[in-house]
Amino acid sequence: MTVELGFHYDEKVDLLLKSASACAKEKNFDTAISVMKEALENIWISDVSFSPANIAKIIPYFQKAGRYSDGVAFADTYLIPKLIEDYDQSGSTDRAFICLYVGKVHEKLALNAKREKIKDDEMFFSNKAAEMLSAYTKLMEIGRIEDLKEEYQQMLAVFGNDYGKWPDTVLKKFEAILK
């Protein structure tokens, strides 16, 4: 049996992300925005996970292109709705990551507002980013407990109901749900 290890990536998205970065480096921000929009369309259908940085990368391009309001509108009407569209059908851990990604978008919006010296927007987006980070942390803990409860059922089948017969390391792992 051969096991192949390697890094799986989406070549098309990777090339689009690099192209957008190159356009931005040349200060061609409108083209960078167009390329990033295409990259995002491909990210949504890719079987590869992308970092929050890749998802939110488009936001600063709007500000640098002198299109601050367009960036806010793009985030509000497209980017954030796209990120949260599966929220209600997701488990706690997936919901946590949705919150993380939305929080990163808000961080970029806050940075744009800071650069534009729009204090009210900066405060608003910073607060939203903090809310999303808090939700991420809480949902990750809920997801951890849910996973433990699932695994606990398997441990019951292996070790039985008498916790005195369970190994100490296993008991320690399940402390959070045995209380």
PLM ranges: what are they?
Residues 30, 34-64, 82-90:
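Short, charge-rich amphipathic alpha-helical segments embedded
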Residues 36, 42-46, 75-86, 113, ...:
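Alpha-helical junction/boundary sensor with strong preference for TPR arrays
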